[in-house]
From Swiss-Prot:
One of its GO terms (molecular function) is ATP binding. It comes from the Bacteria. This is Phosphate import ATP-binding protein PstB 2. ATP binds at G63, P64, S65, G66, C67, G68, K69, S70. Its main location: membrane. GO terms for biological process: phosphate ion transmembrane transport. The complex is composed of two ATP-binding proteins (PstB), two transmembrane proteins (PstC and PstA) and a solute-binding protein (PstS). It is an enzyme of class 7 (translocase). Keywords: ATP-binding, Cell inner membrane, Cell membrane, Membrane, Nucleotide-binding, Phosphate transport, Translocase, Transport. Pfam families: ABC_tran (PF00005).
């Protein structure tokens, strides 16, 4: 009797997706996307996305403008729910739980999956109050607890030594790079499991960019990090895994060094060598 392999009934497209996802089978997976489609009204923006994002690693999304990188990133904490007419088909499993389950507590999801945007967005409050903002929302007001959270979050964000004597001054007086690290401190103060970074260095100068990249490297020992970047050199420097997207589709996903030095797809090679995009 001839025995069929587990993949024998798949078409070639499904087989490629299956193999991409199984490449990370030996890793501890934080986010599993088994097959995701997203629509804005009648227009489809993401097409059958399937990938596994490993725990406590840095995964970068690269691709030309409008390819769906940020759209996919915003699915991981359901920020796209805020867009009128947006519809998601499929599942995203965060540590095995589908975050698109009916009745999901989205506020709690966004605590577990924090997000930092490309333009630093500190609140018009003191540095201290920026860091403890999320904790206060959770009803935590004991001064000792807040003080400890401020110190460890700012230290984790490599900002403590620069602001420890200015905690009660306005956060708006910080430089752009300091503001972005403050936003990261504010995000991790509520102890998320995943950090989503949407082009976090695009508005920063090279020195500030280097500090944020060093911070990303330090933070991955505790957090799963997913970063969207237009800067391929940055993706190569900071990430363990890279996904290349084009026109709403996942073209290639794998180990960063391999993807940049020996891509499996010609489309990927053309993009990273500057032939288009």
């Amino acid at each position: 009797m001839q025995h069929e392999s587990p993949t024998s009934g798949m078409n070639m497209s499904a087989l490629r997706r299956h193999k991409q996802r199984l490449d990370l089978a030996d890793e501890s997976v934080a986010i599993e996307v088994p097959g995701l489609n997203l629509f804005y009204g009648d227009k489809q923006a993401l097409f059958d996305i399937a990938l596994n994002i490993p725990k406590q690693k840095v995964t970068s999304f690269i691709g030309p403008s409008g390819c769906g990188k940020s759209t996919l990133l915003r699915c991981f904490n359901r920020m796209n729910d805020l867009v009128d007419g947006c519809r998601v088909e499929g599942a995203i499993n965060l540590y095995g739980h589908n975050i698109y389950t009916k009745g999901e507590e989205v506020a709690e999801l966004r605590r577990r999956v924090g997000m930092v945007f490309q333009k630093p967005n500190p609140f018009p409050k003191t540095i201290y109050e920026n860091v403890v903002y999320g904790l206060r929302i959770q009803g935590i007001n004991k001064k000792r607890v807040l003080d400890e959270a401020v110190e460890w979050a700012l230290k984790a964000a490599a900002l403590w030594d620069e602001v420890k004597d200015r905690l009660h001054e306005s956060a708006l007086g910080l430089s752009g790079g300091q503001q972005q690290r403050l936003v990261i401190a504010r995000t991790i103060a509520v102890e998320p499991e995943v950090l989503l970074l949407d082009e976090p260095c695009s508005a920063l100068d090279p020195i500030s960019t280097l500090k944020v990249e060093e911070l990303i490297y330090e933070l991955k020992s505790k957090y799963t990090i997913v970063i969207v970047t237009h800067n391929m050199q940055q993706a190569a420097r900071v990430s363990d895994y890279t996904a290349f997207m084009y026109m709403g589709k996942l073209v290639e996903f794998g180990d960063t060094d391999t993807l940049f030095t020996n891509p499996a797809k010609k489309q990927t090679e053309d993009y990273i060598t500057g032939r288009y995009g």
